[in-house]
């Protein structure tokens, strides 16, 4: 047997063995559907989520490397209405939201902006009330792709692919099944960026276990720490809270 023939057979044999090993490793991973449903279970259960129809969150944020601090207030109502206001010391106010149809942002630095394309698709996902519970309505495919270590914990990596827009990767702690990392490709007027988020400090608000600290790692800007200080479920939110600002109406009317 000449060396090239032997080498070729060894390579083929190695490829076969590796393919079998990879297939068996994939079989050992729990299905993404199981992980996503278990997350709902460990954070309170389907019935607890279904009791909530609106929500107000208040908290703070801090850009560690830049020393910038601010406050955050978020209003959300089913099925997909939202309004968020961030006030940064020395930099003014940033707002974004949707009335369920038009998705927009407005800031003292960037002015008014109506989201379209991939940016709009991303906003549709983030504004959906109880998105974690209703993931089957939002994603055309979910798949467990492997294991990743996050802050010393082994986690299952789940890739969720929406009908439109980029895939989202979420990592769930093997032991607790709590989500400990999310990676998205964020679209904005400034371009496309990969953003890693690390939810921690899970505590109960009412019947739900929720993260009260979320660290985001932003390219070129370092870490941003969001701290949730209060969560109110089923508040009466005036309908005009989700109305389009005049500046956004003007942009819409130009189209």
Feature map (PLM): residue ranges:
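Bacterial Sec-dependent signal peptides at the C-terminal "C-region" and cleavage site
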Residues: 21-29
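Acidic/charged, solvent-exposed loop-and-adjacent secondary-structure segments enriched in E/D, K/R, S/T
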Residues: 104-131
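Gly/Pro-enriched, hydrophobic low-complexity segments
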Residues: 89, 153-244
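Short, conserved active-site entrance elements at the starts or edges of catalytic domains
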Residues: 122-159, 178-183
């Amino acid at each position: 047997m000449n060396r090239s023939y032997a080498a070729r057979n060894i390579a083929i044999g190695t490829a076969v063995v590796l393919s079998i090993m990879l297939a068996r490793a994939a079989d050992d991973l729990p299905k993404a559907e199981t992980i996503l449903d278990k997350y709902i279970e460990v954070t309170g259960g389907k019935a607890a989520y279904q009791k909530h129809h609106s929500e107000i969150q208040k908290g703070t944020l801090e850009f560690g490397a830049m020393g910038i601090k601010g406050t955050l207030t978020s209003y959300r109502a089913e099925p997909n209405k939202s309004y968020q206001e961030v006030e940064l010391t020395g930099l003014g106010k940033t707002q974004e939201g949707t009335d369920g149809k038009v998705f927009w942002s407005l800031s003292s630095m960037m002015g008014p902006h109506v989201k379209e394309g991939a940016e709009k698709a991303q906003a549709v996902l983030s504004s959906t009330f109880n998105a974690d519970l209703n993931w089957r309505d939002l994603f055309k495919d979910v798949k467990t792709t492997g294991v990743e270590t996050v802050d010393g914990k082994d986690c299952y990596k789940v890739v969720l692919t929406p009908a439109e827009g980029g895939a989202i990767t979420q990592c769930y702690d093997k032991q607790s099944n709590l989500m400990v990392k999310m990676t998205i490709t964020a679209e904005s007027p400034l371009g496309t960026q990969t953003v890693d988020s690390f939810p921690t400090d899970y505590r109960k608000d009412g019947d739900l276990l929720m993260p009260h600290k979320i660290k985001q790692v932003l390219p070129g800007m370092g870490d941003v720490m969001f701290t949730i200080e209060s969560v109110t479920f089923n508040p009466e939110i005036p309908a005009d809270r989700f109305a389009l600002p005049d500046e956004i109406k003007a942009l819409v009317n130009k189209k």
